[in-house]
Amino acid sequence: MTLRASLRAAVVLFGGCLLVLGLLYPLAMTGIAGVVFPVQAHGSLMYDVNGSVSGSELIARPVTDPRYFQPRPSAVSYNASASGGSNLGPTNPVFLDQVNTSIASLRDAGVTGPIPAELVMASASGLDPDLSVEAALVQAPAVAAARNSSVDEIRALVIAHRVTDLMPFHPEYVNVNTLNQALDGR
């Protein structure tokens, strides 16, 4: 085989792979995803009562209002373009200050008793909207007090919004975004 024939074969193979893997395959997968999983393919968007996009089920948002459940703290200030966890180790004084600040904030919001670690430490992505059912239930009395509701009513809402994965070893969890939206829709 000559150099010219080898180059031609390489260019044709490159062009074919570029066309198939760079254009046709992504378009096909996007089309299939849009048909089979339309909500997820568009970002699992959430809508308010006016039909406007209020966020995504997949990305936590900062919550300052005591009438809502608090998500996990974010190491990146809930900035999705800079997602990532904290590199601070357990012996770092900055980390200890962040944990103590989170604990104080939860106490100020009315949370009593032991506080689960996930409420004071950021997740690996810094944007995780999910909490264990226990972490949500710890906040239920404070949310109920801020909303002038019964604790049992708020706890029932948490239980109604728990999610169970197909894997038997994965604990149940609650999506804070959908739970907070449900608080306004009760």
UniProtKB/Swiss-Prot annotation:
Record GO terms (molecular function): ATP binding; P-type potassium transmembrane transporter activity
Topology relative to the membrane: Single-pass membrane protein
Key words, A-Z: ATP-binding, Cell membrane, Ion transport, Membrane, Nucleotide-binding, Potassium, Potassium transport, Transmembrane, Transmembrane helix, Transport
Signal peptide interval: none
Intracellular or extracellular location(s): Cell membrane
InterPro entries to which the protein is assigned, alphabetical: KdpC
Pfam families registered for this protein in UniProt: KdpC
Membrane-crossing segments per the record: 9-29
Top-rank taxon, per record: Archaea
Record's subunit section: The system is composed of three essential subunits: KdpA, KdpB and KdpC.
Function: Part of the high-affinity ATP-driven potassium transport (or Kdp) system, which catalyzes the hydrolysis of ATP coupled with the electrogenic transport of potassium into the cytoplasm. This subunit acts as a catalytic chaperone that increases the ATP-binding affinity of the ATP-hydrolyzing subunit KdpB by the formation of a transient KdpB/KdpC/ATP ternary complex.
Family: Belongs to the KdpC family.
Protein name, UniProt field: Potassium-transporting ATPase KdpC subunit
Organism: Methanosphaerula palustris (strain ATCC BAA-1556 / DSM 19958 / E1-9c)
